[in-house]
Amino acid sequence: MMHTNRRAFLQTLTAAGFALTGMGLAQASTGKPAAAAGQEVLAITSATHGHALEAAFVQGAQSAAARVQHSQLQGFDSSSFQQLHTLLNDQQETLLVGLLDDASATLVLDLVRSAGGRVLSEAHHRIAADATGWAQQLGQTLVSGQTGAATPAQPGRESRVALRCLI
């Protein structure tokens, strides 16, 4: 059992820490910066089956930010990865959000880390191909930096990786 004086001391330290940094409790809990006004956002998807899931994800990202570029990775097509490589090496800070298949996500995350980018979040999901409402909300959530409800794994569903990086 914690001694009363020690508990009060720890509570005071915690409160002082938040006051000194000027952080609200909501910001402190997420630790993820939202897209700044005017910041470039790149939304990437993988064209695995060409269904509406990817389009809904991009639509959600576009509703949460003013400037959103979209790049669709066509398998292991070099032109899509070349565009990403160019963005990784420019001097402009870009928020990268994506809804990708496992293989594409592995490559993208390796490129981001190799270029010194920061992976802010990465989540694995098993979802139905027609979960467009969920995908749209995910796009909004990743761009805004909010935490969204995780989708439980569902057997027999498609595997996707949602990611949020600062490049």
Please state what every model-predicted region is:
Residues P33-Q39, T86-E93:
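Flexible, charged surface loops at secondary-structure boundaries
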Residues G75-S78, A115-A123:
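Extracellular or exported targeting regions of proteins
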Residues M1-L20:
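N-terminal secretory signal peptides and thylakoid transit peptides that target proteins
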Residues L107-V108:
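Long, helix-rich, hydrophobic modules that act as membrane-proximal anchors or helical bundle/coiled-coil regulators
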Residues T30-K32, Q62-L88:
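A short, well-structured beta->alpha microelement
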Residues I44-H49, L96-A103:
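Structural motif
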Residues V119, A123-I167:
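Glycine-rich, aromatic-bearing surface loops/beta-hairpins
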